[in-house]
Amino acid sequence: MRIGLAGLLATAGLAALGTGAAGTGAAAQQSGGLAPQVEQQLAHGRTVFARNCAACHGADLTGGQFAGSLKGPAFLARWGDVPVSQLYDYIHTSMPPGGGGTLPAADYGALAALLLAENGGTPAALIAANSAQSMPPAPPPGEAPSLGLPGITDRYPFPASPPLVDRFAGYTPVTEAMLSNPAPENWLAWRRGHMGQGFSPLAQITPGNVRNLSIAWAQALPAGATMAEPLVRDGVMYVFGFGDQVFAFDAATGRQLWRYNRQLPEDAAPLSKKTIALWGDKLIVATSDLHMVALDARTGRPAWDVAIPDSANTRSNGGPLVADGVVMIGLASQRDGGSIIAAFDAESGAHLWNFNTVAQEGAPGGDTWNNLPNAARHGGSVWTSGSYDAETGLALWGVAQTYDTGPVRDLVPGSNNDGLYTNSTLAFVPRTGELRWYYQHMANDQYDLDWVFERVIGDVSVNGQPRRVIMTGGKEGLFDTIDAATGRYIDTADMGFQTFITAIDPVTGRKTPDPALLPGRDRDAVFMCPHAGGGRNWSPSAFNDATDTLFINARDTCMELRPRAEGGFFTSGVDVYFSAPADSDGNFGILQGIDMAAGEVRWEHRRRAPYNAGVLATGTGLLFTGAMDQTVMAYDQATGAELWHSGLNGVPNASPITYAVDGRQYVAFVTGMGNPLAFGLPNFTPEIPLPEVNSAAVYVFALDGE
């Protein structure tokens, strides 16, 4: 199999594991003293090598016409002193070319063991993905051939390669000041900065030239559900990919700078995440096996790795917030007793505190669970990252509802069934975990209409005066504005599609559901809007401080809750079914601009295919988002008019971002269908099939000729 010279040089020998073998692949036999299972693994490695690798690398591993030597100084110049687990990871990910991971895990372990042995090492135990043993030492500088490849003559010198930009030269630590007010060219945190606004002041791309956007570069990501919003810092893009792989790319060209591949245990299913976080010289990652890992932002090497305490039977879908030197992470769960938010020191990884998102007996708020014991209290998941207000010094987190609706539906006399802290905003002091205040947006949620989403911090005109506020909305399309310092209620804006809230207290903001729409086994079927899988949902909003306008997309769907004699999706005894609204015109995608000072919708744009990506706003009056029909588009912030669109080879699944490198502005989208909006909603548009092959990629656009 012919492969490019660049690939041969990059791998320093490992280049073509995986073509049909043309030889026996005889390798040096090991001397006695090895454990029988290790001898068996080496024998298996020779068989696998002969079958898959020898045709390119030579039967004796010394190289062939198309691939280099896998033993000796040239090979060890690249792989000497490296943990065998990294060699295993490389082979597993990259070999055979174009088919990485297609061999059994035992084959990859056997190949890594063979390469260790052929380079003078002695396998101390069976080699696997997590082996701690290292390769033999690298040769002294100058003793290894510069290329180490067969089939290349030194008759004529190679021309000089184009110079590569060192994006990490002069790296300076990321500070709280940077995260709270990022430089225009950077996208440093989820929603760009700690304010959670999803807004960039960059001005090169405008309503007048946005039609000239075209692909600047693209990079494949591991196939699978991918919804993480990339980060960009000084020309480096960081992306979390499926299977807990993290990438650093040159943000101007897409050239990979490094990759981290988490070796997950067999019982840990890989989960998509919404974000990763930068702090100091570290990139903080929440893993699917419920660890927090700090990677060196320049190399991808782990700086610390700690398990999240009290995380059994939880999952990590959101992503970390790092503020005031503290890493915070929320977890999702339906376990007894509810879920948690955990905190760690950003420099050392030392655990600082846990907070129970379901109030416990005897604790503040513990008397709001209908007299239930702790073990019978459920929910309070946190599957979205938080925000941080540097003015108040408070970290702001949203909490979801409880699926266990039955035990709290009907009030026990003398009790309270609000169910704190479900559907609440929590304001913490990051270093201590002190809960400074909370505000519950929707008490006793019987419909799975979470308020767990982003907390947007901004200054909005209230009674003619600017006021520091927090804005957030639930699935029902109601957006509350509360005071950033105290959590006191200010106002609610309504997107206009919910049908079950009949009153909102103007002083407290408490919402009153229509009692006729309370679902249960003892009642008739209930029809209401929106559906828990529709409405405003996983895709976050964007906010323009200068115009007091919040931009949000939603899905115009409703639900029928049907009673069951036994069981049910909700423990109140009902199953949930999707439905179109009674007066639907078949346009299920909604995009709105909401005046948060007036509490009114300024404009609305509708389309057939539901939106799937979050919203990005820019200082030139543009909005970017994406939809289920594999389309990304730009709109005018003032009117909602569509100005540009482009097709992609996958469903845009994360929020778009924008950044600049060397004076050129880029807009990036991540594909990789997998957030919950892809469940159920495609049935509303059967003529728009979702991709059968779930690939993932980063697509980066820029203006032609810039």
Predicted regions and their residues:
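Repeat-blade elements of multi-bladed beta-propeller folds
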Residues: 187-191, 223-245, 268-292, 315-338, ...
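The canonical Cys-X-X-Cys-His
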Residues: 45-60, 111-115
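Blade/loop signatures of beta-propeller domains
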Residues: 149-215, 357-364, 511-517, 580-581, ...
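Flexible coil segments in periplasmic/lumen-exposed cytochrome c-class electron-transfer proteins
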Residues: 31, 98-194
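Extracytoplasmic beta-rich repeat domains
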Residues: 218-231, 259-279, 305-319, 356-385, ...
